[in-house]
Amino acid sequence: MVMAAKKGPGPGGGVSGGKAEAEAASEVWCRRVRELGGCSQAGNRHCFECAQRGVTYVDITVGSFVCTTCSGLLRGLNPPHRVKSISMTTFTEPEVVFLQSRGNEVCRKIWLGLFDARTSLVPDSRDPQKVKEFLQEKYEKKRWYVPPDQVKGPTYTKGSASTPVQGSIPEGKPLRTLLGDPAPSLSVAASTSSQPVSQSHARTSQARSTQPPPHSSVKKASTDLLADIGGDPFAAPQMAPAFAAFPAFGGQTPSQGGFANFDAFSSGPSSSVFGSLPPAGQASFQAQPTPAGSSQGTPFGATPLAPASQPNSLADVGSFLGPGVPAAGVPSSLFGMAGQVPPLQSVTMGGGGGSSTGLAFGAFTNPFTAPAAQSPLPSTNPFQPNGLAPGPGFGMSSAGPGFPQAVPPTGAFASSFPAPLFPPQTPLVQQQNGSSFGDLGSAKLGQRPLSQPAGISTNPFMTGPSSSPFASKPPTTNPFL
């Protein structure tokens, strides 16, 4: 400008020429500021206060680049900061030199040199109040301030990025600078660490190759199992029975005696379970012989016999409730089991003719009637050669007049029961005195108006030789029939 002023011939030529040179110089400095905020330093692209991208202002007080919002907050501090717009103001040479010596990176080292992110938090840029409080802590109170003489600013070269210089404040550095000179040791460690991995993979693959596959072992085991049963893959293994050997359904097991004997449903003269009489000569309870002429007590289960001629009220009741016992064998049954009473083949106890005759244990009676309990008084019976009249004993059929005796059907269950223990005899067998036992009806007229002839079976499941009681007629000696 001085040179232009000297050359100007006129009085106003130097002023116009100096103004133009001033505008040209300011344009050069403004372009330099834009370069600083654009591409010369990467840290200047973001706001120093809120880290927002797109800086528009320059803080001449501290030498940083900020956004529009933070520029207004900086003006409100005490003392207020001097802020200029990058595109709408002019800059002088000292200002540009100061901005070149500072910038956001150097300002961070100075004003945030003692800042610890673990104890302090950067406020959110969307909350202006918190940002203002943060700026007051930073600039007014200088809470994290570090003197500039301890921080060296970056050196700039035209058209190139600046290289920061080591300072007292730690900053983010590459891994190579942290490790130092023996940096290749990291690669060596990586190679050594990768080597055991590869070796382990090799060992694992080798172990897998040496081990047989699991399905082959299973297949071998199954082949061995098939070989044990003869090599037939379709043969079923012979398994031992889980339970004891029991006969098949319907089979018969050998009789063991007692309650578990089920031979009553099969053929043969074996003893039945319920209500069967023992064979002749095998009475359950044999009474001991007593002297002749004495009255013999009946064993358990037998009822003493009462004479028919003695006028005994109990005998009358017994004769009223049940018919007379036939001379022949009367089949008696309880619970559907076949059992036949021998024809007056009771066990004779004693040796005299005056002793009473008792029945062996095992005979059963009708469950609807009770046996007549008479005292064993010996008496003379004109209808019996031994002088005794048989009475209804335990196990003998003595149905009352209200319960007619039913004749069993001719094919219901007769085939499934065994043969009678004693051969049946013809009903109305003549005794030694020439009269049958059925003549008792004539001896006691009026006491048994609905009596039936002797010899009719009371077992509904046995086939008897007599016909139906409704078809048969009583003897003609009864005046009521």
UniProtKB/Swiss-Prot annotation:
From the UniProt entry, list the residue stretches annotated as the region Disordered: 150-220, 271-309, 431-481
Which sequence ranges does the entry mark as zinc finger (C4-type)?
47-70
One GO biological-process annotation of the entry reads: spermatid nucleus differentiation
Superkingdom field: Eukaryota
Q: Does the keyword Metal-binding apply?
A: yes
Gene3D superfamilies, alphabetized: Arf GTPase activating protein (1.10.220.150)
Q: Which UniProt keywords apply?
A: Acetylation, Metal-binding, Repeat, Zinc, Zinc-finger
Q: Does the keyword NAD apply?
A: no
An MF annotation (GO) of this entry: zinc ion binding
Residue ranges with Polar residues bias: 157-166, 188-210, 283-298, 454-481
Domain Arf-GAP, by residue range, is 27-153
What does the record note on quaternary structure?
Interacts with EPS15R.
Q: What is known of its domains?
A: Contains FG repeats and 4 N-P-F repeats.
Designated name of the protein: Arf-GAP domain and FG repeat-containing protein 2
Task: Supply the gene name.
Answer: AGFG2
